[in-house]
């Protein structure tokens, strides 16, 4: 009898690996504001040492795709919304989920878990830098940007549990993120690795560069 768990797992992983974003090697906005040690390895193009489980990320991709399809159905001619915009500036590529042409708002979809609001929006530097960088990239490519927004969609919640964070676009935030990127690039050039920032429990599950030996990747914070 066919092993259905194995079949589904291999199919999902292969499909995800074939996606353009999965094959992207240049550092994008989503990577800049998180752990600097992971960013260092991204820039250095370190070979992943921890493949981990990709199901949550894969489901997040499908939710993104579903939202995009739903918006296209409601706005088939793109009168209000422009979707999946590929842009680049300062050597940073980005894929913007959604741009509202009427309110000039950059929108980024986030899949979250119910009850994790304390890690969402203003409490999450990585997300804030990311969405303001999207605004910066769009402005550098001729778009008008007035506001940025994050929409958190819980995989395990109800419609009423959807979270929204929005604020006026602030170029200073984007420039702060770009400065952080440049400083980390300089550290890569000098082979100076930042200290680990995350504990073992987090790194083992979520970081592709977790390496208990520390020889190639990152050993996480050691007690």
Positions of the model-derived regions?
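Short, low-complexity, polar/charged sequence segments that are solvent-exposed and flexible
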Residues: 100, 125-129, 167-172
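Metal-dependent nuclease catalytic cores that hydrolyze phosphodiester bonds in DNA/RNA
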Residues: 1-106, 113-120, 129
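Long, highly charged amphipathic alpha-helices
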Residues: 62, 66-69, 133, 176-183
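Metal-dependent nuclease catalytic regions and adjoining charged, substrate-binding loops involved
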Residues: 2-6, 137-223
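Residue-level recognition of conserved beta-strand positions in structured domain cores
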Residues: 109-111, 152
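Metal-dependent nuclease catalytic cores in nucleic-acid-processing enzymes
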Residues: 65-73, 122-151
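Short acidic, glycine/proline-rich loop/turn micro-motifs
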Residues: 117-121, 160-163
């Amino acid at each position: 009898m066919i092993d259905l768990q194995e079949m589904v797992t291999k199919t999902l992983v292969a499909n995800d690996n074939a996606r353009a974003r999965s094959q992207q090697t240049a550092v994008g906005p989503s990577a800049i504001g998180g752990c600097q040690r992971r960013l260092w390895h991204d820039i250095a193009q370190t070979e992943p040492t921890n493949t981990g489980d990709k199901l949550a990320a894969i489901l997040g991709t499908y939710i993104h795709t579903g939202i995009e399809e739903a918006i296209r159905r409601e706005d088939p001619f793109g009168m209000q919304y422009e979707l999946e915009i590929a842009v680049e500036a300062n050597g940073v590529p980005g894929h913007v989920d959604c741009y509202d042409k009427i309110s000039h708002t950059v929108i980024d979809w986030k899949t979250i878990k119910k009850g994790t609001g304390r890690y969402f929006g203003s409490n999450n530097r990585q997300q804030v830098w990311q969405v303001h960088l999207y605004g910066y990239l769009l402005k550098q490519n001729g778009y008008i940007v007035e506001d940025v927004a994050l929409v958190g969609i819980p995989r395990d919640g109800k419609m009423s549990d959807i979270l929204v964070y929005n604020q006026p676009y602030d170029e200073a935030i984007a420039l702060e993120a770009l400065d952080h990127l440049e400083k980390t690039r300089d550290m890569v050039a000098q082979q100076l690795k930042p200290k680990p920032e995350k504990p073992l429990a987090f790194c083992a599950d979520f970081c592709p560069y977790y390496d208990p030996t520390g020889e190639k990747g990152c050993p996480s914070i050691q007690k």
